[in-house]
C-alpha cells in the first residue's frame, strides 16, 4: 500500500542497472508451492542488489500459447483436436483459448502480493500480444536469412494425443521418460536363400527382438552390426516344436538358450520339454550376412516406391534383406535389429543408406502415409486409394486390424472428460498382444514376454509418443552447437554441475530444433509458399506483411488489404494500433501473397514451438528491434545479469534462451543462473494433485505467514538441492 516496490525503482533512477528476467508462467493453471520456492530465490537476489545501489527492473510475464492452454480448452469444451474447424470454428476456439489462458491471473497476482514478491504486474509482457509476436517473426527471419531455418521430412517425436510433433527439449522434460511394461517378441524372419549349413535342420530364420510389435507389419529390413559375431543354431521352436535353424549374435546365445541344454541331443527332444536342445553349426561376422534376403514377416501391405511427381509403383525387390548398421549392439535383444523406416530415426537413416524402401500406404488423396495415422491407429481400408488397396493390400489379413489403436492410451474409451485412465488402459489387452498371438499361431514368434523398458511420453498429455515421419520446419541448431558450448562456459551456473553436466551434455548431443506445431493457438510460422514449393518468403514484421499484401491486392489474389481496412498504420507501435489486427489463426491463414513470378503463396499451416515464445522474451518483452533498440544494443537490458528457475527448465527455458541468443546475437542471454531443486513432499515423493500430496501455498501462507515460509524454503537446503517440504520442520 506504500508502493515501496515502485519507489525502489524511481529512487534508483540513473543508478547502475542489474538486469533480471522473469520466466513467464502460464496463468491457465493455479500456482503451486514450487513457485514460492523459485520466486523466493529470485526476490532475495533482486532485493539484495537493490539495497546495494542497483536499479533492478522486474517485468512480469505471461506464457499464453501452446499445448497447456489448448488441451485445457478442449477438456472444458468436451471436444478433441479433430472437432476444431468442424463443430467449432478456429476463430471461436482461439477466442476460447485467449479467454482461458488468463483465468487464474487473479490467483497469481494474489500469491505474488501475499508472498511479498516484487515484480511489475502493471506492465507485463504477454506472449499472445501482436507486438510480442512481431518480434518473434523478426527473430525467425534472422534465422531464415542465416540459412538456419529449413523444411524437412524426417522421423520426429509425435504425440497422437496432442496431435502435434514435439521437439527434443520437450521430450526431455523431467518425467517424460518412464519405465513401462510392454509385451515384446523375438520374431522369426524366414530366410529365402540360406547358407548351406543354415538349411540342414528345419526352417532357417533370422531372429530379431522388438519392444514395439505393432511396428512389425511395417518391417522392410533387418540390420546387423559390422563388428558383431553371429552364430547359426539348430534347435526347436518352444511353442510349436518345429525344427529350425536360427541366426543371432554369439554374445546373446545364452540369453535365448539354456546352457544346461547344450549337451542334449537334438534328436531326443519331445514337444513340451522344458529344456530345448541346441547346437551351434556356423559362425559369421556381420558383413557375411549383409545382402541375405528373407520373406516379409507380416505380409499385409507390399512396399511401394514413390517418384518426385507422387506416382507410386510396387517396390521391385529392394526390401526384406539384411543391411549393416553401426548402432546395433549386443546389450539386449538378438544383435539383429528389426527395421521399420517409418517409425524410427535410426531405422530411416540406415534404410535410406542401403536403398531400402519404407512401407507406406497411399490414401485417397494420393498422399504417402505410414501404416499408422496421426491419431495413432492403423488406417481404415476405406481411407486408402482403391488402386493401391487392390494391388498392394492383402485385405483378408489386414481388415481384422484396420482401425486398431497401436497403443491403448490413444483409444478414446480410456479418456473420459479429459481424464486418462492409465490403469484401465494398461489392464486392457493391447494391439501388441494381438499381433504376438497372431505370430505365435503362424509359427513366427520365437519368444514372447513382458519387458520393462524406458519409453518417452508427451509432457502435456502424459501419454506415449510415437516416432513418426513428419513434414516439419526446423532450426538448424546443430550448426551453432560448438558456439553454444563455448558461450555456455562463460555462464556462472549454480550449481556448476548443472552447467557442465545436465546442460553441457545436452548441448553436446544437440539435435536440430523441430519448430513446427500442427495446432491452432500459438504464434503462426511466418512463411508463405507457392503450391509447388518453388518460391517462398519469410515475413519479419507486420509492416513487411502489410506491404506484401498490397502487392497481392494489385496482383488480384486478395480483394483488399485487411490491415488497411481496419485502420492499421505501419510504423506506429502503440498498443491501440496493434490491437486493430490479430496475427493469430485463422486470420493470418486468410492472407494470400504473391511470389516474384506472380504465383499465389499460402502460409505454411504450422505454429511454432511455444518454447520459442518464452526463449525470445529478452527481445519480445521490449518489442525489439521496432522499439527500444538502443536499450538492448547498448546492453542496458541485455543480457540478464541473473535468472533463476527450477531444474526442470534446464532443457526448457534455459536452453531456448541460450539457443536464440547464440544463433541470432552470438551472445549469451544470461550471465548467471540458479537452477533450484524440486519441492517434494515430506517423504521425498513428487507432489501431485492426483496423489493428494500437493501443498497449497495460499493456506500455508495463511497459517504460517509468508516470511517464515520464505525463510524455511531458502535455509532448509541449498537452493539447488531438492527440498522435502514438511510443515513440522
Question: Which positions does each model-derived feature cover?
Answer:
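Surface-exposed intrinsically disordered loops and tails
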Residues: 380-430, 571, 575-577
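Short acidic, Pro/Gly- and aromatic-enriched capping/linker segments at domain boundaries
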Residues: 282, 433, 439-461, 587-606
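Conserved active-site neighborhood of enzyme catalytic/cofactor-binding cores
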Residues: 26-60, 68-71, 75-79, 157-162, ...
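N-terminal, positively charged nucleic-acid-binding surface of large information/translation enzymes
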Residues: 1-241, 340-345, 350-353, 360-376, ...
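Short histidine-centered catalytic/ligand-binding loop motif
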Residues: 31, 380, 415-426, 492-500, ...
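Extended, non-catalytic structural segments that build the interaction scaffolds
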Residues: 92-100, 325-345, 487-503, 694, ...
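Catalytic alpha/beta core of large soluble enzyme barrels
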Residues: 228, 232, 236-364, 377, ...
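A sequence-level detector of short linear motifs
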Residues: 151, 245-247, 370, 380, ...
